[in-house]
Regions:
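Conserved luminal/periplasmic juxtamembrane motif of membrane-embedded glycan-processing enzymes
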Residues: 1-151, 166, 180, 258
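Active-site-proximal, structured, solvent-exposed surfaces of multi-pass membrane proteins
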Residues: 129-259
């Protein structure tokens, strides 16, 4: 899996890979890494990578990684099940259930997550509750509520997107709660539940979250680049001014030539 990081095999083979993503760091996602998985940092704190920690299959499942490509044929079978071999490449399946979105009834505050999270208990915290700005304050792991049957039996399914700016899906919620999507939280995302827009929140410090009521729901998650409409409008105005100045200059030249 480390070789794929450098060769970007996902681009060559036509699938959506997560090994390499080159951009300015998302500040919210960086905060999640700082608090929950600082070992993801690679070389310095301006970049982080999954592959050095790929054997942590809880992290893989939490972020929606179902399969792993590796040149090693002897990965820990309690974490990754060998599915098939293609020449020198081995395909493994994560034995933990991986999802790109999940449902929570339990919540804790962001401050509680920051205060309590460490390498020993982060899996318990992330699996049990969703951290929200106005979530429930706790002082110790013993203050966590038990995972209810409603939380266990609820489900979220996100469909493979037909275009990058729009994702659809469904929620089967056995109680009022929240959906957490493995989408970095940032301005520009809007969420509609059954056609009605709902307020988005920052979940687990770095991801997109939103509330849903008990029942069966249809989801639409859409991204609009912040400032795009204003930028397009300003560009149109500038072009109008530019062409107007060109036309004015040409008319002046014609008048000067005639006189």
């Amino acid at each position: 899996y480390s070789s794929a990081t450098y060769t970007m095999d996902s681009l060559a083979q036509g699938y959506r890979g997560i090994s390499t993503y080159n951009s300015v760091l998302n500040g919210n996602l960086k905060e999640f890494v700082d608090v929950c998985y600082p070992e993801l940092y690679y070389m310095d704190q301006n970049r982080y990578a999954f592959w050095p920690n790929a054997e942590d299959n809880f992290l893989a499942a939490f972020t929606g990684v179902r399969y792993l490509l590796s040149k090693s044929g002897d990965l820990d079978s309690s974490k990754y099940e060998l599915m098939q071999q293609f020449g020198g490449i081995y395909l493994y399946r994560n034995v933990q259930e991986a999802a790109t979105a999940r449902f929570y009834v339990n919540t804790i505050s962001e401050d509680s997550l920051k205060e309590l999270c460490n390498e020993e208990n982060r899996e318990t915290l992330l699996e049990n509750s969703l951290a929200l700005e106005d979530g429930r304050e706790i002082e110790d792991l013993s203050d966590l509520e038990e995972i209810s049957d409603a939380q266990k039996k609820s489900s979220v399914v996100l469909n493979a997107p037909e275009k990058d700016s729009c994702i659809t899906g469904t929620v089967s919620a056995r109680a009022d709660g929240y959906v957490l999507c493995m989408i970095p939280y940032e301005n520009g995302w809007t969420v509609s539940v059954d056609g009605e827009e709902v307020e988005t929140e920052k979940g687990d410090l770095g991801f997109l979250a939103f509330p849903v009521k008990e029942g069966e729901h249809q989801l639409t998650i859409t991204f609009h680049a912040p400032g795009l409409k204003a930028g397009v409008g300003a560009s149109i105005v500038c072009w109008i001014i530019y062409f107007g100045m060109l036309g004015y200059g040409r008319r002046r030249k014609r008048k000067a030539a005639v006189s």
